[in-house]
Regions:
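Conserved SGNH/GDSL esterase-like catalytic core that processes O-acyl groups on lipids
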Residues: 1-42, 52, 70, 128
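Active-site segments of SGNH/GDSL-like serine hydrolases
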Residues: 23-27, 49-84
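Generic structural signal for well-ordered alpha-helices
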Residues: 43-48, 86, 90
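Histidine (H) residue identity feature
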Residues: 35, 49, 56, 110, ...
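Structural recognition of the beta-strand scaffold that forms the well-ordered cores
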Residues: 18-23, 58-63, 99-103, 128
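Extended interaction regions within the primary functional domain
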Residues: 7, 14, 30, 60, ...
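Catalytic His-Asp segment of secreted/periplasmic serine-dependent ester chemistry enzymes
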Residues: 66-154
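Short, functional N-terminal and low-complexity linear motifs
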Residues: 10-17, 55-56, 102-109
Length: 154
């Protein structure tokens, strides 16, 4: 079931959240689906609900990372599905009034997954990053946060 507002208030009174980071979508993506409007609407509802439950907490929606598949004997970004889903997530974040972080671009954009696999930072399914890749992305994420905080004078 959904998180009730009452339960969220109880939880927040015990351990208040400074930030909530959401990351969804990798397994939703398929090469055949290029329209993620219903996904974006549902994600907007989820984020708005969290905003209601935790009104003083910053919320960041991490976009989907790169995902590759084999085409003509070589692994390549699952075009244009990755970009379509990432844009749907960006729209959902904008609509819900939260920050969007572009994981796909942070991974290097088109064919970024190839670099992750080559460096042992993603599984050979060319879909899922591993702990080493997560550490690399986390470093980029923190750099982005620090940059924005400095830019905003926080």
């Amino acid at each position: 079931g959904a998180l009730s507002r009452e339960r969220a208030v109880q939880m927040d009174s015990i351990v208040p959240y400074d930030a909530i980071v959401l990351q969804y979508g990798l397994n939703v993506m398929t090469p055949e689906i290029l329209h993620y409007g219903s996904y974006a609407r549902k994600m907007t509802e989820v984020v708005r609900h969290l905003r209601e439950c935790y009104p003083h907490t910053d919320i960041i929606l991490m976009g989907v990372g790169d995902r590759s598949r084999k085409a003509n004997g070589a692994f390549v970004t699952m075009p244009p599905a990755v970009v379509a889903l990432s844009e749907a997530q960006r729209r959902a974040a904008r609509s819900a009034g939260v920050v969007f972080w572009d994981t796909y671009e942070a991974m290097g954009g088109h064919n970024g997954m190839l670099d992750y696999v080559a460096n042992g930072q993603a599984n050979k399914d060319y879909t899922h990053i591993n702990h080493k890749g997560g550490k690399r992305l986390a470093t980029e994420f923190v750099k982005s946060l620090e940059y924005e905080m400095n830019r905003e004078g926080l």
